[in-house]
């Protein structure tokens, strides 16, 4: 039981703390999309596919928003719950 609680706590904390780190590592930073990053390649591909612009609400637009503005409280809650569930299983 204690191991499950510990795993849940660690999993939840890692998910919430790791998401912004993962976004930044992909190139979705607080100042926008980093040059020559995975995010830049994703944006280029999305723009080409959409005839020159990135569609509002697309994956790239959503990740860019999360990179600049941060994750919402509800998103952090969902990430925490998912991380806790995975942590409890491990």
UniProtKB/Swiss-Prot annotation:
Keyword Metal-binding in annotation: no
Main location as per UniProt: nucleus
GO biological process: response to virus
Induction info: Up-regulated by interferon. Up-regulated by vascular tissues injury.
GO cellular component, as recorded: nuclear inner membrane
Highest taxon of the lineage: Eukaryota
Disrupted-gene phenotype: Homozygous knockout mice exhibit no obvious phenotype, having normal growth rates, survival, fertility and litter sizes. No organ pathology is detected. However, they display decreased restenosis, the narrowing of blood vessels, upon vascular injury.
UniProt cross-references to Pfam families, sorted A to Z: Ifi-6-16
Family of this protein: Belongs to the IFI6/IFI27 family.
Subunit structure: Homodimer. Interacts with SKP2. Interacts with NR4A1. May interact with BCL2.
Name of this chain's protein: Interferon alpha-inducible protein 27-like protein 2A
Lineage: Eukaryota, Metazoa, Chordata, Craniata, Vertebrata
